[in-house]
């Protein structure tokens, strides 16, 4: 996956892909120096169209899935985490929004 390769070139370590639980699915979980990045990947004709596809309900599911991930991995709930969104447009260009829901 292009997005995974992009993050790994930047020094991130892939922890999980398509991690599933009853709360939802996380596309990618990546470890960076001081945080876990939970990543949602969206593809559409344009980057803005891809971002528009993420609503409040999906954000809640991502957050709940992230909490379930921390519990499953026995990580403390005060672990430094962030939520990134990667969008791919129709020609395969990647845009990353770090801390997208802050």
Name the predicted role of every residue range.
Residues 21-23, 32-34, 89-90:
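A generic beta-sheet turn/junction motif
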Residues 43-91:
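Catalytic cores of nucleic-acid endonucleases
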Residues 19, 42, 100-101:
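Residues forming the ATP-binding cleft of Hanks-type serine/threonine protein kinase domains
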Residues 26-47, 62:
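Conserved catalytic cores of phosphodiester-cleaving nucleases, focusing on short active-site segments
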Residues 88-102:
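Short, low-complexity, polybasic intrinsically disordered segments
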Residues 1-17:
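Acidic-basic catalytic patches of nuclease active cores, encompassing PD-(D/E)XK
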